Amino acid sequence: MKHLKFYSILFLFSIFVYKVNALQKILDGYFLSDEEGLFLSCKHKFDEYFCLEKCVESGAKDGYCVGHSFICFCKYEVGSSPRHFMF
């Protein structure tokens, strides 16, 4: 009985690890900021993911995410610096 419990826990843990890794691989896509330009969300063709960070400059209104939702490049509005920042 102990072996069954152990393997059940191991199986559930492996499913959790697989889901986390799968999510990180599909999070590339565009992001949009809120009205204040602070919180960003990555848009994938199937779902929307939050970048969980504040943009370095509040002027960022659009951009794109690379790798997963914690790495975002910010574009700036017309008249602002054209450089991209990562946070």
UniProtKB/Swiss-Prot annotation:
It comes from the Eukaryota. It is found in: Secreted. Keywords: Disulfide bond, Ion channel impairing toxin, Neurotoxin, Secreted, Signal, Toxin, Voltage-gated sodium channel impairing toxin. Residues 1-22 form the signal peptide. Putative sodium channel toxin. GO terms for cellular component: extracellular region. GO terms for molecular function: sodium channel inhibitor activity; toxin activity. Disulfide bonds join 42-65, 51-72, 55-74. Its main location: secreted. Belongs to the long (3 C-C) scorpion toxin superfamily. Sodium channel inhibitor family. This is Putative sodium channel toxin Ts38. Expressed by the venom gland. The keyword Ubl conjugation does not apply. Gene3D superfamilies: Knottin, scorpion toxin-like (3.30.30.10).
